[in-house]
Amino acid sequence: MTLASIFVLYSEAIITKVFLITAGTFGTMAFVGYTTKSDLTSLGKLAFMGLIGIIIATVVNLFIGSSGMDLIISYIGVAVFIGLTAYDAQKIKHMLAMCPDGGEQAQKLALMGALSLYLDFINLFLYLLRIFGRNND
């Protein structure tokens, strides 16, 4: 599903509601990931394994076509991308701390980190949209 198609599939009210929920959740988890003293590496590994599981389950569900399985995948997707948001925020902080001069390497790391967080936000938004959009069909 592309971002343009959501305006055809969902109402403006649902899109707005889900966007606000996503923004709040994303901001909170990015803040937690950035400020926590705990090492989130194990959370990142767990979330990555969950992401692989989501991909496999989605492919299987293409053949099965179960709406219940789709809902379960969506809830797991939300949990995975919440975890990845916190992990990626902490990872960016640690990577940029290793480049105190702020040179070209730091700019490349910042760009890659921004892309990771962008993908976390978009995927979190899409999974939440699938959950909330289902309730209003």
Positions of PLM-derived features:
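A hydrophobic alpha-helical transmembrane-helix feature that marks the membrane cores
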Residues: M1-D137
